[in-house]
Amino acid sequence: MTTDDDMRMWDDEAATFDEAADHGLRDPAVRAAWRDLLLSVLPPAPGRVADLGCGTGTLALLLADEGYVVDCVDFSPEMVRLARAKTGDRTDLTCVEADAAAPPLESGAYDVVLCRHVLWALPDQVAVLRRWVDLLAPGGRLVLVEGNWTTGAGLTADATLTLLEEAGRPGVVRHLPEPAYWGREITDERYLVLA
């Protein structure tokens, strides 16, 4: 579970969160890169997606625009408020204020569980992964986008694969060094895991 201090930190970050090229996807080229990446690993739409730790809902909205039905979860009230403002009254996208580590979503109901830059920040990561896998329908896909940043935060790809093995869900890594995803050159490790 996450703490009140964590929640306040992300509430404070919410107003400027989308300024990062890979968060707001405001640059059409960055948005197109993420669209193409996600569509290459997701089953064809329509499908049901749980976007856990959704932030301001940018990826959820991108996927809803592609024909997916998306339930997004974030524990930051301010992030959820901004996500709801972006998504309006769409019927293909809902935003829930809750902890991504223990989302109040139906087991076995999702074709995809998507988490971007979330797992690294959570305690008891193996238990969290097991819960996320429990949300998947038969044949469902767990898609994790993580990194090991120069700030010292994050998880290496190898560490993420080990956690997935411990959770009983082996994965495959695709490294993402291309500036197209981040809006700039990067020197840290960033990757997607499909499990």
Q: Language-model segments: what does each one mean?
A:
Residues 1-45, 151:
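Conserved class I S-adenosyl-L-methionine
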Residues 153-168:
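Short alpha-helix
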Residues 170-180:
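Conserved S-adenosyl-L-methionine
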Residues 101-112:
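A short acidic, Gly/Pro-enriched loop at the edge of an enzyme's catalytic core
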Residues 140-147:
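Conserved beta-strand signature within the Rossmann-like core of class I S-adenosyl-L-methionine
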Residues 126-138:
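A short glycine-rich, Lys/Arg-flanked "PGG" loop and its adjoining helix->strand segment in the class I
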Residues 48-52, 56-103:
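Class I SAM-dependent methyltransferase SAM/SAH-binding core
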Residues 112-125:
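A short SAM/SAH-binding and catalytic strip from SAM-dependent methyltransferases
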